[in-house]
A protein has these predicted regions:
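A common structural junction motif
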Residues: 20, 99-106, 142-148
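Conserved glycine-rich beta-strand-loop-beta hairpin in the small C-terminal domain of fold type I
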Residues: 49-59, 70-84, 94
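Surface-exposed helix-capping loop/turn segments at secondary-structure junctions
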Residues: 42, 62-72, 148
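Conserved core segment of the aminotransferase class I/II
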Residues: 1-49
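Conserved PLP-binding active-site segment of the aspartate aminotransferase-like
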Residues: 82-87, 105-143
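Feature representing long, continuous alpha-helical segments
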Residues: 10, 28-29, 33, 56, ...
Length: 148
């Protein structure tokens, strides 16, 4: 809802109605059948398995290639985890260096309004397969060895 002066209620309603389009009835029916027939639950189970495999690849490869640099945090769900830096170093400089090499590891400070003591990165694993995770971890290890 929106609070507006009485004289603007009409114009706001017209603008809202012109940009607000609901989901077409046909699409709603297809999605309803998809869910009623159990395909949605099957899809969720399949994706959970895929994401768990990718998380474990990230964790295991980090333990193998980055043990002196990152402490990967456990996660039971989601598509990202946190890797805390074990050394006091410039997470932003590391993130920028990784970005130049095609690896996205966003610094935790990006998500904080106040300065925090823990430095590290958010690491996504949902959109990359285990082979891509391995090549990214190797790039991270090489970059960390160069800069730390």
């Amino acid at each position: 809802f929106i609070i507006s002066p009485l004289g603007l209620v009409g114009p706001f309603e017209r603008i809202f109605n012109s940009i607000q389009s609901g989901v077409p009835t046909h699409s709603q029916a297809v999605i309803s059948d998809f869910m009623d027939e159990g395909y949605f639950a099957t899809h969720i189970r399949r994706m959970r398995s895929i994401y768990a495999e990718r998380y474990h690849a990230l964790r295991d490869l980090s333990e193998r290639y980055l043990p002196e640099f990152l402490d990967i945090q456990p996660t039971q769900s989601g598509l990202h985890t946190v890797g805390f830096l074990k050394q006091d170093t410039d997470e932003i400089a590391l993130s920028l260096a990784l970005d130049k090499k095609g690896v996205s590891a966003l610094p935790l400070s990006r998500y904080c309004l106040k300065k925090i003591d823990n430095k590290g990165f958010t690491l996504g694993f949902g959109a990359v397969n285990p082979d891509q995770i391995k090549s990214s971890i190797i790039i991270m290890a090489d970059t960390f060895n160069e800069l730390i």
